[in-house]
């Protein structure tokens, strides 16, 4: 409630400023000192209900109302625009109360796209949720008509919201309170464009009546606005949840998906959650869908004045047919599709190439039962991502495991050998480790030095005996560490908090097979790197030995 009062103070002050500006009497705002008397004076002047005036002046919600009143006044005197003034307070509200507010840069991009769809100032644009506040203000400033649907109990006092066009100096606004936080995508054929995003505290939103349970069908598709934008968490592009999978199928199969954009991190105030924009068009002549990756951190909230050129999408990203999207399992992952059409992938598949699964055996690491104290055990070491150095060589693992009798056979099968390669498929996705100079001695059950197994975040690669004439472990290792292949892994990485990559994408990785001489050359370079690294380690140890030890002074 405290944060809501802060926003209402700023909102009301901006409203009075707009009123006084029309009258040419801004000095009266600058001269005001006390918040309570200010509210009573100008609330009555504007014709606000006496209960609303009393609520705004009620100090039980916030004892330092004068601070935010004076802060807003100062921003007005400094020439700060109404939208920037409100957003500065909204950021505080978002941080403390959990209400998500769009960054101004993202809002500018969304508004630019939506306004380009409006034929004239009478065209209605639908926006949903309090998060859309900056989008609404930008559209109103451009003199457009906005229908704003938002959940009940949002931060700004609902009785004040109809005055937003007065604050923005233009536009028309229709307010509708959403029941049960349901945000319709459309439903009014007069709306040329629609903007939908998660509302309030809700993680998801509803498309038409309820797309999670009843995705778009033929009848509801007819109710879609001519052009619509959905802003949602990027996870919706690849989530395996049945409802979201079905939602993607409907968008693709009905050919109403025009573009998919991956936005920079930080699109919402005080949140690292990544957003994606889905642009829908009810009537489309083309069967191609545009994919564009704008996830560069340089475009994040730290540089919040960026603006995605929605009107020039044809010059960015790649186009993928709806047939190809269906064949991919209706995955809308932007990085995957951009990479599939990239120069890097063409480089990887130039000349002779085979899928990784055709060249190596791929084994996913499994947990090994530890000793429960009931019998003899075996000591082993488990390789973690932190055990891989900058060159990709696995140094002596630090994690020791005592394997129980029931886990010995599994441990022996998981043994790492010289030339094995590890790929991280969870967490540090794409990190490559090479097993160098190790020979497990399974006859000694207590010595763990040469008994290494891969941690559960890895898959183990071992060249098939039938393929040793085509490549060496050293060449494959250097190939997997190349920038092009690392970009491939990044494009297949799913998830935000804990990234992961599917086994199918590892297996399908194209491996370029050059001439034998080139492979031998890469193997020689690998060995040269190892020689240099060993020399560096020797010199580092020599430097350490030259350090002064006070105990040696006589």
Regions found by a protein language model. Give the residues of each.
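Long recognition/docking surfaces used for binding and targeting
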Residues: 12-97
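Conserved S-adenosyl-L-methionine
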Residues: 97-203, 208-211, 233-235
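Conserved Class I SAM-dependent methyltransferase catalytic core
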Residues: 202-273, 277-278
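A short glycine-rich beta-alpha junction/loop motif
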Residues: 272, 278, 335, 449-459, ...
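Short, well-ordered beta-strand micro-motif
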Residues: 277-281, 293, 384, 460-463
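Non-catalytic DNA-recognition/assembly elements of restriction-modification systems
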Residues: 312-377, 508, 515-554
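Sequence-specific dsDNA recognition surfaces
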Residues: 357-372, 386-418
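A short beta-sheet element
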Residues: 412-480
């Amino acid at each position: 409630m405290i944060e809501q009062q802060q926003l209402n103070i700023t909102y009301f002050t901006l409203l009075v400023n707009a009123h006084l500006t029309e009258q040419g009497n801004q000095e009266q705002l600058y001269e005001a000192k006390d918040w309570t008397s200010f509210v009573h004076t100008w609330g009555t002047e504007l014709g606000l209900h006496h209960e609303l005036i009393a609520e705004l002046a009620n100090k039980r919600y916030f004892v330092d109302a004068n601070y935010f009143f004076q802060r807003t006044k100062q921003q007005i005197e400094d020439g700060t625009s109404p939208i920037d003034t409100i957003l500065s307070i909204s950021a505080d509200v978002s941080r403390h109360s959990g209400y998500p507010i769009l960054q101004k840069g993202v809002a500018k991009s969304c508004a630019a796209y939506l306004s380009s769809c409006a034929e004239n100032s009478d065209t209605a644009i639908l926006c949903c949720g309090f998060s859309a506040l900056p989008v609404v203000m930008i559209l109103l400033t451009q003199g457009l008509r906005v229908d704003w649907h938002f959940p009940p109990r949002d931060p700004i006092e609902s009785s004040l919201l109809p005055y937003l066009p007065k604050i923005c100096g233009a536009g028309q606004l229709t307010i509708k309170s959403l029941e049960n936080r349901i945000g319709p995508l459309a439903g009014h054929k007069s709306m040329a464009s629609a903007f939908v995003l998660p509302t309030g505290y809700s993680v998801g939103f509803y498309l038409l009546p309820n797309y999670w349970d009843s995705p778009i069908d033929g009848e509801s598709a007819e109710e879609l606005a001519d052009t619509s934008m959905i802003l949602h968490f990027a996870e919706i592009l690849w989530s395996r949840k049945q409802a979201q999978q079905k939602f993607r199928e409907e968008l693709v199969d009905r050919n109403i998906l025009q573009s998919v954009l991956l936005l920079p991190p930080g699109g919402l105030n005080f949140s690292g959650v990544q957003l994606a924009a889905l642009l829908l068009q009810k009537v489309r002549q083309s069967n191609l869908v545009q994919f564009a990756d704008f996830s560069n951190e340089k475009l994040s909230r730290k540089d919040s004045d960026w603006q995605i050129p929605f009107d020039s999408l044809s010059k960015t990203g790649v186009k993928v047919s709806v047939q190809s999207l269906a064949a991919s399992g209706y995955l809308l992952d932007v990085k995957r599709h951009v990479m599939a059409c990239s120069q890097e992938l063409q480089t990887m598949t130039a000349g002779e190439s085979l899928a990784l699964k055709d060249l190596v055996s791929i084994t996913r690491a499994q947990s090994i039962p530890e000793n429960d104290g009931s019998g003899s055990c075996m000591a082993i070491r488990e390789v973690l991502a932190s055990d891989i150095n900058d060159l990709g060589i696995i140094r002596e693992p630090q994690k020791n495991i005592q394997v129980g009798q029931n886990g010995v056979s599994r441990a022996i099968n998981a043994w790492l050998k010289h030339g094995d390669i590890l790929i991280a498929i969870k967490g540090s996705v794409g990190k490559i480790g090479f097993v160098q100079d190790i020979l497990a001695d399974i006859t000694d059950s207590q010595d763990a030095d040469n008994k290494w197994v891969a941690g559960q975040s890895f898959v183990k690669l071992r060249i098939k005996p039938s393929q040793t004439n085509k490549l060496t472990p050293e060449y494959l290792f250097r190939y997997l560490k190349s920038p092009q292949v690392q970009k491939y892994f990044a494009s297949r990485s799913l998830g935000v908090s804990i990234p992961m990559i599917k086994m199918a994408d590892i297996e399908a990785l194209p491996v370029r097979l050059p001439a034998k001489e080139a492979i031998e050359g890469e193997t020689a370079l690998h060995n040269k790197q190892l020689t240099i690294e060993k020399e560096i380690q020797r010199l580092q140890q020599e430097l350490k030995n030259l350090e002064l030890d006070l105990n040696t002074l006589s």
